[in-house]
Amino acid sequence: MAVRKPPITTREYWAPGHAACAGCGCATALRLATKALSEAMEEKYGDPNAFAIAHATGCMEVVSAVFPYTAWKAPWIHVAFENAAAVASGIEAAWKKLGRKGKILAIGGDGGTADIGLQALSGMLERWHNVLYLMYDNEAYMNTGIQRSSSTPYGAWTTTSPPGKYSVGEDKPKKWVALIAAAHQIPYVATASIGNPLDFVRKIKKAGKIDGPAFVQVLCTCPTGWRSPLEKGVEIARLAIETGIWPLFEIENGDIWNIKIQPPGGGAKVYKEGNRVVRIEFKKPIEEYLKLQGRFKHLFKRPEAIEELRNQVKAMWKVLGVEAILPRPEE
């Protein structure tokens, strides 16, 4: 009888018993990422443990390292909110001097990456350190009280962007750090989502094997900050892809004219010119994604705000070179 090989290693680097909220999508992302990176190191260097982690202050750092305990089964350093990329750069330089082979994994949330740590990230990428930077994007400063970040999407409720008579909630468009990273013309940039775990694992393995800097921005659901059912995290993350809210793409060597778009699924029709995706007709409206999250509840009393978000999503796809057709619920 044939034995089916599991899609990912059974080795664990993220132990149970951590203090993350029930249904935390970021915990799922870090568990998968470390397992995938372990596989990449085994395939490239013959050593599954050939990596070390520099982890910025944030949700996942706090819940995984409540002194004197730790959930990490790999070399791991807790660093300041803003300097995961800088510390990872130093570790990489030391390993190079010692002749030690492997990959350094830097981990930061959207606050510690898109805002506070953006300068350190840019420097790390520009200096061409052999570091994989993983941005786990739950779209707000969840650890410190659900404050908005520059990665918070338009219309979302946070404690610092509360909706009201004169406010729609967050009134700025989302910052796509992956595109900023790609502007450094580094070997590899990708977006991912826990709603498509196999795609995420593939991208982490690919990023891990590359010589030089790599950047992966993964969407992680947060039931606490998103006011969503804790058991629906993966479903919500998948709907983000299927409605067009969250694009899955890869950019290699800064070639923004040859962005590799992954099909969103969900019944969407994808049109290509050669190998390049030029048009996607989405079947599911963005309302299917929004309605499962309390942070967007107020938008259903403001149809003009939902329309503005729809236009922002179209504009984001246009930057990627894709015409996005986003349906409305009645269509």
Swiss-Prot record:
Its EC top class is: oxidoreductase
| Pfam families associated with the record | TPP_enzyme_C (PF02775)
Under the heading SUPFAM superfamilies, the entry gives: Thiamin diphosphate-binding fold (THDP-binding) (SSF52518)
State the reactions this protein catalyses.
2 oxidized [2Fe-2S]-[ferredoxin] + pyruvate + CoA = 2 reduced [2Fe-2S]-[ferredoxin] + acetyl-CoA + CO2 + H(+)
**Which ranges form a coiled coil?**
none
Q: In the Enzyme Commission scheme, what number(s) does this protein have? A: 1.2.7.1
Its assembly, as annotated, is:
Heterotetramer of one alpha, one beta, one delta and one gamma chain.
Q: Which PANTHER family match?
A: PYRUVATE SYNTHASE SUBUNIT PORB (PTHR42897:SF2)
- What name does UniProt use for this protein? Pyruvate synthase subunit PorB
- Which species expresses this protein natively? Pyrococcus furiosus (strain ATCC 43587 / DSM 3638 / JCM 8422 / Vc1)
